[in-house]
Regions:
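A hydrophobic membrane-anchoring feature enriched in long, contiguous, low-charge segments
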Residues: 4-29
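Glycine-rich helix-loop-beta junction characteristic of Rossmann-like nucleotide cofactor-binding loops
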Residues: 62-66
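Catalytic core of membrane glycerolipid acyltransferases/transacylases, capturing the structured
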Residues: 20-41, 51-53, 68-124
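Thr-Gly-centered strand-to-loop micro-motif
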Residues: 61, 96-98, 119-121, 149, ...
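Structural motif marking the loop-to-transmembrane transition
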Residues: 1-11, 34-38, 103
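Generic preference for hydrophobic
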Residues: 60, 73, 95-96, 202-204
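Non-catalytic C-terminal accessory region of glycerolipid acyltransferases
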Residues: 3-4, 128-237
Length: 237
């Protein structure tokens, strides 16, 4: 059954994505936020399919912690699920991502129109300056900013290196940081075709005032909170 559900989801994804990419391209004349609301409908459709085809549901703990003003989300990264679900759970957001993702046919074209902060990871300090410049603009435009400090998907029970770029951005922009932990990787593995039914738990921490931190201390505080929650969400056997 899991195989058939996963196959049906993949087929639906293949059928839905190209026509939605055309819809996304048609949003080009719209204001950024209006454009985002239309394009993020694809992610909402994928989460609907995940629930009704794959049997993957989710619950959110700590939604009351979301500040009223745009913030920087620093989250655990385990699968593609959270990149979709966050567009349902959180206010309109942009992602800090590697620019190569924008080169993917259909998916990348639509992604480019959501106003992401696309950086060249190999350009070092120039990438940080670019991230800060675009970050301030996006926050002023009413967007939240979502970043995975580990930089890549990490298997449940494992921990990657927490890079300080997201904390550095928050400190430089004076934006609050919202730490997020989840266990999506237990059901939707990294690069896995098979996706298992169940309920993903997403935990949202209290916002952290970046203005009272250095990038290093903020990064450490985020890591401590996330990994503390992960011990319960993804206990090591």
């Amino acid at each position: 059954m899991t195989f058939l559900r996963s196959l049906a989801f993949l087929i639906a994804q293949i059928l839905v994505t190209p026509p939605y990419a055309i819809i996304a391209l048609a949003t080009f004349p719209l204001p950024r936020l209006a454009r985002y609301r239309v394009i993020s409908g694809w992610s909402r459709a994928m989460i609907w399919l995940a629930k009704n085809v794959l049997g993957i549901q989710y619950r959110v703990i700590g939604a009351e912690n979301l500040p009223r003003t745009p913030a920087v989300i620093l989250s655990k990264h385990q699968s593609a699920w959270e990149t979709l679900a966050f567009q349902v759970i959180f206010p309109p957001q942009v992602w800090v991502l590697k620019r190569e993702l924008l080169w993917i046919p259909f998916f990348g074209w639509g992604l480019a129109l959501t106003s992401p902060i696309a950086i060249n990871r190999s350009s070092g300090a120039r990438a940080l300056r670019r991230m800060a410049e675009l970050g301030r603009k996006r926050l002023a435009q009413g967007f939240w900013i979502a970043i995975f400090p580990e930089g890549t998907r990490v298997r449940p029970g494992k921990k990657g290196t927490y890079h300080p770029g997201g904390a550095w951005l928050a400190v430089n922009c004076g934006a609050p940081v919202v730490p997020v932990a989840h266990n999506a990787g237990l059901l939707w593995g990294r690069g896995a075709f098979l996706k298992h039914p169940g309920t993903v738990t997403v935990e949202i921490g209290a916002p952290i005032d970046a203005r009272s931190h250095t990038p290093e201390s903020l990064n450490a505080a985020v890591e401590e909170w996330i990994e503390g929650r992960m011990a319960n969400l993804c206990p090591v056997p």
